[in-house]
Amino acid sequence: KITLFAQVIQKLPKELIKSLAKKHGTDKYAKGFNTWSHLVSMIFCQFADCVSLREISNGLHSANGNLNHLGIARAPSKSNIAYQNEHRSCAFFRDCYYALLNYFGQQISLSGRKFRFKMPVYALDSTIITLCAEVYDWARYTHAKGAVKLHTLLNFRTLLPEYVHITDGKSGDNTAARNVEVKPGSIVVCDRGYFDTLLLRFWDSIKVFFIVRVKENLLYERIEERDLPDKAHPEVLIDEIVRLTGN
């Protein structure tokens, strides 16, 4: 519902976004569709799961009576969105992302939310975003479809994405993970798509701890079994030091 969406939008620091728009000069030649309206429209695209510019425009037009709650004077046309998507600097949206990440990260820190780990804990995963193969021929994924893959590092403390790496849709998770910036002393939790001995050795070399699901055909030998602490979680069955023996 648009009223629920409006509550989300009202959480955005409008003055911060205005200052970024001024810095990048993105409201020059705005033609009635300023930077704030553009940002809100693209966020609406994600929340409403729109698959075309027409759906964005029609969706906002259907909420004409509530647009003032979004800080928008009028709903944009399809051509307005298309023009500004092509001509408005992507640098604004990049800086906007990092500014909002910092802003909301501070808000969460000030809220006093408890976190049981002293070390930073991250979840690393990827998702496919489909694209039109005819328009984005560089992102061809299959014979008929295009796609890019987003590799996202989610901070468990703030529940916010801290780093996003974009590759072509065919890129392997383990390959792309080498370009994801993980701070030494952190814990990374990931699926078996990231189980790669070279990647794990690299993380180990920079003092990054990892929790990863192993592949079913993993070959290894047991070196030592450690005693479990008295307060070990009941689902922790065994603690072993092992050596990988596969090629």
Language model features: what each stretch is:
Residues K1-H24, G112-K114, I223, D227-N247:
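A short, flexible helix-boundary coil/loop motif
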Residues Y98, G105-Q106, G112-K114, E134-G146, ...:
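His/Asp/Glu-rich metal-coordinating catalytic cores
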Residues S41, I56, A75-I81, Y122-I128, ...:
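Short, conserved catalytic/metal-binding motifs centered on acidic residues
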Residues K1-D49, L53, N68, I72, ...:
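Dynamic "connector" segments at or just before major functional cores
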Residues P161-N247:
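An internal, acidic/charged active-site-proximal segment
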Residues S52-S62:
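Polyanion/phosphate-binding surface patch
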Residues A73-W138:
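Active-site- or DNA-interface-adjacent structural scaffold in DNA-acting proteins
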Residues A147-H151:
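Short glycine-rich loop/turn motifs
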